[in-house]
Swiss-Prot record:
The keyword Transferase applies. The gene is glmU. It is found in: Cytoplasm. This is Bifunctional protein GlmU. Mg(2+) binds at D102, N224. GO terms for molecular function: glucosamine-1-phosphate N-acetyltransferase activity; magnesium ion binding; UDP-N-acetylglucosamine diphosphorylase activity. In the N-terminal section; belongs to the N-acetylglucosamine-1-phosphate uridyltransferase family. In the C-terminal section; belongs to the transferase hexapeptide repeat family. Its EC number is 2.7.7.23, 2.3.1.157. Homotrimer. Its cofactor is Mg(2+). Acetyl-CoA binds at A377, N383, Y384, S402, A420, R437. PANTHER family: BIFUNCTIONAL PROTEIN GLMU, NUCLEOTIDYL TRANSFERASE.
């Protein structure tokens, strides 16, 4: 049976007090709506229909690369009205999941369970038991079966004591949506078209409404203001850290870790405090990440140790490598096994061979460095001429003295030595010594200028 996902994302988000549409507010490094779209794709939905309104152009531009049908809700007249807008493009057969752009963390497994129970009756929903149901629609049951959903403003005093609430997440056959949605009425306290009224229509048709509860309550929590956004962020990060610990990761403090993407981990990985992982990363066995590090789209092989406050973006790091503290690896950095990258060393678009070292205050950009070479403190590859980037090639077992400038394009042959303080503009032959510096001048008995006493 084909699955359509309908995402309601037209709200203004006034309480956010932001020029950014609410569904574009970031959570764990991804827009709220992006989380919902990701889940829809995990479900292999044939159709994803997103209803937009406030800031629609911005929203559509943000997700321009996604295969989405966009439907405008020019006037926000309720959730039922929003779903009515999809009828011209909604398939006649199959089922639809109705989700929300500001309820970002409902999980694939939960929705798969909802689909399964809904297939038996043609309609199902997610409900939740809460201690304080104020403001939420109540689930009214008779003999255990759902009879209606009553919005808080329309509820009687007795109904307001009910602690089972409507999350707004439904799975409904498309045939029934085409039948029920045109019948919705706005004769209620809010003057809106409630999607919840389809429950009463299902009961009137003699259908039993299936329901499930989420394993984790935060899955169905919505975001209306920045306080709720921050609270949901922390709940989500707590859950992600828990799942990583179950996979064998040791955290110095799981409350001080942020995962803003995905990470694959080996055995016995250790992560210190205030580490941020973004994009898609992979950490091998026995990898250690020091305090305050940021990793983005990076792979680090087994046994590597990263010291504090190092930043990685698009890097590939080999086994048993030592990095940091305060190192920066930029896109295209590829380090072989047993490499040493020390404090205040920046590596960009550079391959570094087995066992090579750059331990202090160095910039290596657009370079290829062989095995067992040593790059002295203060060395830079001068790769940019103001218009184009040029390559520096350094062979195996090369020794580059401190404070050297290698002006690309230039090649340093295997076994060569470059004297400290040199500006190398020509190729250096294998097993040779090259140095370039002005003659030292010394003046005896030199008197420095003195400040005049006031």
């Amino acid at each position: 049976m084909s699955t359509t996902v309908i995402i309601l994302a037209a709200g203004k988000g006034t309480r956010m007090r932001s020029q950014l549409p609410k569904v574009l507010q970031p959570l764990a490094g991804r827009p709220l709506l992006g989380h919902v779209i990701k889940t829809a794709k995990q479900l292999l939905a044939e159709n994803i229909i997103t209803i937009y309104g406030h800031g629609g152009d911005h929203v559509k531009k943000t997700f321009a690369q996604e295969n989405i049908q966009w439907v405008e809700q020019a006037e926000q007249l309720g959730t039922g009205h929003a779903v009515q807008m999809t009828l011209p493009v909604l398939p006649k057969d199959g089922i639809s999941l109705i989700l929300y752009g500001d309820v970002p963390l409902v999980r694939q497994t939960t929705l798969e369970q909802l689909i399964e129970v809904s297939n038996k009756t043609g309609i199902g929903m997610i409900t939740l038991h809460v201690d304080n149901p104020t403001g939420y629609g109540r689930i009214v049951r008779q003999d255990g079966k759902i009879q209606a959903i009553v919005e808080h403003k329309d509820a009687t005093e007795a109904q307001r004591q009910i602690q089972e609430i409507n999350t707004g997440i439904y799975c409904v056959s498309n045939a029934k949506l085409h039948e029920w949605l045109p019948k919705l009425s706005n004769e209620n306290a809010q003057g809106e078209y409630y999607l919840t009224d389809i429950v009463a229509m299902a009961v009137a048709d003699g259908l039993e409404i299936a329901s499930i509860q989420p394993e984790l309550a935060f899955e169905v929590e919505g975001v209306n203001d920045r306080l709720q956004l921050a609270a949901l962020e922390r709940e989500f990060q707590k859950q992600q850290a828990k799942e990583l610990m179950q996979q064998g990761v040791t955290f110095a403090d799981p409350a001080r870790f942020d995962l803003r993407g995905t990470v694959k981990v080996g055995h016995d990985v250790r992560i210190d405090v205030n580490v941020i992982i973004e994009g898609d990363c992979e950490l091998g066995d026995f990898v250690e990440i020091g305090a305050g590090c940021i990793l983005k789209n990076t792979t680090i092989a087994a046994g590597t140790k990263v010291q504090a406050y190092s930043v990685f973006d698009g890097a590939v790091v080999g086994e048993n490598t030592q990095i940091g503290p305060f190192a920066r690896l930029r896109p295209g950095a590829k380090l072989a096994n047993e490499v040493h990258i020390g404090n205040f060393v920046e590596v960009k678009n550079t391959t570094i061979g087995l066992g090579s070292k750059a331990n202090h205050f160095t910039y290596l950009g657009d370079a290829e460095i062989g095995a067992e070479s040593n790059i002295g403190a203060g060395t830079i590859t001068c790769n940019y001429d103001g218009a184009n980037k040029h390559k520096t090639t350094i062979g195996d077992a090369v020794f580059i003295g401190s404070n050297s400038s290698l002006v690309a394009p230039v090649t340093i042959g295997n076994g060569a030595t470059v004297g400290a303080g040199s500006v190398i503009t020509k190729d250096v032959a294998e097993q040779s010594l090259s140095f370039e510096r002005a003659q030292q001048i010394s003046k005896a008995n030199y008197q420095r200028p003195q400040k005049l006493k006031k």
